[in-house]
Amino acid sequence: STLSAEKIVALQPNLIIDVGNVTPNYIDQAKRTFVQTGVPYLLLDGRLSATPNTLRELGKWLGVEQLTEQQAQYAEETLKSAVDFSAVLQQTAYLARSAEGLQTGQKGSIHTEAMELVGLRNVVEGEHKGLTQVSMEQLLLWNPDIILTQYAEFFQTIKNNPQWSQLSAVKNQRVFFIPNQPFGWLDSPPSLNRLLGVRWLQHLLSNKPMADFAPEVLHFY
C-alpha cells in the first residue's frame, strides 16, 4: 500500500526499510521521504544476486546478525546451486503476468531474474529492463519452450485459448503455475520469496516429483 509522509510520521517508526531498486530516482525518493518525515531511510539493493549482502546489512541494523548470517548463507547456497544448474539448461521461457498473460518482464528485469538465474532464456528483450506489454503476434514469433505464470485465471484458460494453443509450450504441456502463497515464489513481490522459487524451478525442470519438494518449503519458512 501507499502511505503519505504524514501517516508515516504518525506511526512513529524508528526506521524505514525499502528493499528494491536502487537507481537514482529511488535514491532521490528515499532522500525526499527522509526530509519529509525525519525517519532514517534504509534503501537496500533488491536484486537476487545481492540478497546475501542485503540480509547481512539488515542484520546489522536490526541487531540480529546471527540470524541473518544463517539466512545469508542459505541465499548463497541457493544462488550457487542455480548458477551450476544453469550451465546445463538450454530452454527459452516467457513469464506471463496479468489475467490476459500479455504483461511480462524484459530480460534482466527484477521480475524475471529468478527464472533467468537457473538458465531459462527470457524471450523478451528490452532496453529499460522493466515490465512491458507484448502482443500475441510477438509471442507467436518468439514461441517460448516454457511459459510460467502465477495468475490462476490465466493458467485456467490458456489451454483452451485457440491463440495460445498454437505455442509450443502449450502443445507440449510446458505451462507451469508458479506457487503464490503467501507470496509469489518468482515475482510479486520480487524479494526473498524468490530464493524458494529458484529452488522450486530447479526441482520442476529436473522433472522430480513435486511432493518431494515439501521438505524444502518447510525448511525455508
State each model region's role.
Residues 1-9, 78-85, 105-107:
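Short, composition-biased local secondary-structure segments
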Residues 1-61, 132-169:
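Acidic/His-rich segments in extracytoplasmic proteins that coordinate ligands and/or metal ions
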Residues 26-103, 124-126, 133, 179-221:
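Extracytoplasmic substrate-binding proteins
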Residues 84-87, 104, 114, 137-141, ...:
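Short, conserved, surface-exposed binding loops centered on an aromatic residue
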